[in-house]
Amino acid sequence: MRFNINNIGLVLCVFLLTSCVYTKFTVYKSFENIETNIRYYKVEEKDGVYKWVEIGIHTFFGAGRKDYLTVSFKEELPKNLTIKSSNFGNIDSAYREDYKIFSKRINIKDVKSDTVYLEFNDNKRYKFYYDFEEK
């Protein structure tokens, strides 16, 4: 059996290009002056019940670029929560209770900024923003 070294090199190159994946996560900022620990913000679900939430753009690089708007919680998920983005609509497409994550694939092309609204059942509302031109 004969192997052509050029074919092996081509296959190896394609494999490396498609299998090398790395990620980047950038955090949204809060409009309000609320407690934070760099990536997570402390929000009040209802009187005296607080949750730590992280909101950001999670980008996967590999064979192609994929961007996701991700909202994750450190503890159990809050009840009666609505998450909306000014550019990308409702964020609920990849909800999994065991992961405590809401995620939606987005296209950030031509988007200058975005605002995410977390709204709890008792009308508590938090706003977070991301400026894509600030990078």
Map each language-model feature to its residues.
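Intrinsically disordered, low-complexity segments
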Residues: L17, I83-K84, I91
